[in-house]
Amino acid sequence: MGIQKFLFAVVAVIMLASRVHAVDPPPIDSHLFQSGELVYTDGFDGPLNKKWWQTRTKNWEVVDGLLIGAPDYKDVAEAQTALKRDHHLGLSPVIRLDNLPSKFVVRMRVKFEGKEFKTGRPKFDIGHHINTVTFRDNGYVVKLHGGKQFLGKAPDVKLNEWLDVALEFQEGELWIEVNGKGQLIKHEQVVLEGRSELTFKTFEDAPNRIMFDSVSLWKAN
């Protein structure tokens, strides 16, 4: 069991105990915030929680404690025949973690399948095409909507392996941490601009599944 899965199990047990014995939920673990409320946590042991997740492609399912997204079609020809168009073919799994608070902390364990990193993939958007985090060998790039970029190094950032990712957000400030190494970004372009979501995208050629092992979201004060 990975450390993120173990921590999720601890959080889930504490939350269950709090309902029975009125124990306070675990405190927020944050570089930016002193307090917050745990609003969602999931180890994917049941059906997909559609309050928090919005699938943008069709082939998403919860299997054996994992949320897994796969391509809707095996190749371009099959997709174009089925959809009768040449764009938005569903070859790259896409999903959104929705309804983010204006100030939040999210911790997750995610894996991107693939043969090699490519320009702009795999990635997730903070807001709708506003701020983008793109993974690459042993690191990532944060690109703000005005074009400003921040490079980040992190250990063991590889395809086909689990990544422990933490984000802390409030307007003007973003803490990002990958596999235990983080950085604080302060910039006026750190905004959501009305779209409170994280959107995950990957390659269009197989192997290209996206997998989530656990996620926890706090509303920060």
Describe these PLM feature segments:
Residues 8-17:
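Bacterial N-terminal signal peptides
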Residues 73-145:
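Secretory/extracellular carbohydrate-interaction modules
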Residues 23-57:
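Extracellular carbohydrate-recognition regions
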Residues 49-79:
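Extracellular glycan-recognition surfaces and repeat-rich motifs
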Residues 186-213:
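Flexible glycan-contacting loops in extracellular carbohydrate-active proteins
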Residues 29-30, 92-98, 151-157, 187-188, ...:
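Beta-strand-rich interaction surfaces with strong enrichment in secreted/lumenal proteins
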Residues 144-164:
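Short, aromatic/His-centered strand-loop micro-motif at the edge of beta-sheets
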Residues 44, 106-108, 161-178:
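Short tryptophan-centered beta-strand motifs in secreted/extracellular beta-sheet-rich domains
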